[in-house]
Amino acid sequence: MFKSYTSNDNLLLPPCLGDFIPQNDPVRVVHRIIEQINLEKLYRRYSPQGCSAYHPRMMLQILVYAYLRNIYSSRRIEEFCRNDIRFMWLTGNVTPDHNTINRFRSSRLKDVLKTIFATIVKFLVAEGFVSLDVACTDGTKMEADANRYTFVWGKSIHTRISRIAEQLEEIWQYAESVTKQELRDSAPITYQDITPEKVEKALCQIDDALNGVDADRKMKAKVRRVRKSWPEQLRKYESQGKILDGRNSYSKTDNDATFMRMKEDHMRNGQLKPGYNPQISTNRQFILNYTIHQCAGDTSTYPLHMDNFHSLYGRYPDVSVCDAGYGSEENYLYAFRHGIETFIKYNNFHKEQKRNFRNDPFLSANFYYNEETDGMYCPMGQRMERLSDARRITDNGFVQTISRYRARNCKGCPLRCRCHRSRSERIVQVNHRLRKIKEREREKLLSDEGLKYRSQRPQDVEAVFGNLKNNKHFKRFHLRGLKKVEIEFALLAIAYNLAKVAS
């Protein structure tokens, strides 16, 4: 009735672990490809002296295969190395502990894993799995391994320093009025040059001036109190400013994480959480390039992302396909300078295709512009005079030129109520260089080739993020610090690509 079994039966010969693993198992793909790539840079991170270490090729294989199996904890990886036949086959029946696995992941792979990732992608290109000619780029936000209530805000630091400067000025003026003499400095410290040393020196001068003078006891006590606390607070704000490094916020748990509004907002309250902004470029749903950014927006990440692509492969993609989050003047010109053909949507691209937008003569985008005479004409046909040119500087230091035009006489115009509601004449702002770029880009996006790339992009790059977040359950990083986050995402990208090969 039942098949017999014996748990304690001994075999005549020791079994080979590979005999129990199917030939089409993903672990064989991981083993085969990583065995073929050059890991010389990784070997150089080891010293020939001291006790022998676990082989870095074997350690890399078990980490990549663990990420392929959605195993991200070093303790769970150690457990699988002891109990899972596939991990035992990769390690050759040796079992590195979780500390060894974590040290290898966090320290040994630093600054070399990106090169290993590029080597694997080049191998896949040579095998015909993927091409570097077309790159679909997109980004997403992922939570950092940090508590959501450990925020430090840049504006809050600015406010507190300003408050100290204002109170110091009040104390200074009081000391001058009581002592009936001018203090050595004509004025206290402004916000721009406030430092702990200058504040300490100023408070010492005030304290010396108030000694032996019939002054308010509360004011004297306050001076003695802030003489101890303010320099210490300013040193704290100074160190926090260095950590911010131009950002608006950071987390005390992970100083490199920035507070962002995540796409997964289960409470629907727009709560900010510490996280990173990974950017990837894909082709045929293989990840070609990745970068990790600390800013929430995608627009400013494009030049750095493409520079990284060039550093990995010595070339830029022939075609770059992106959504409207990357459609800025800076990015279009960057791609043009480096010979990249762009199919990048811009803001209002889809809105422009609607009949209501095209047929509305009162929208500034539909105003007629004569390039030869530099004339902008309103719906009534009146020529608008050019007022001035303004400059705008982006976060990356890119300079935009904005031209301002003003209508000559809106008073008594029969179309005024439909044209604008301001009391003065209507003013229109135009970026002429961006306007020309948009005209060229619109023509490409509406062509047959543009329609092909626009329909291909969501299936390519957005499907990868959906796979990583939902099928691989990777919605939050498990390591802290920008360098370690880059290592973890590289392992995830390598594992994802090799899983695609295995499938």
Descriptions of predicted regions:
Residues 22-64, 432, 437:
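Basic, short loop/linker segments at the boundary and entry of helix-turn-helix/winged-helix-like folds
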Residues 36-41, 84, 88, 471:
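A short secondary-structure junction motif
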Residues 3-7, 51-52, 89:
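A short, ordered amphipathic alpha-helix with a cationic face
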Residues 3-4, 63, 70-83, 94-503:
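Anion-binding and metal-coordination hotspots
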Residues 1-28:
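Hydrophobic alpha-helical membrane-insertion signals
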Residues 10, 23, 55, 113, ...:
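Generic alpha-helical segment signature
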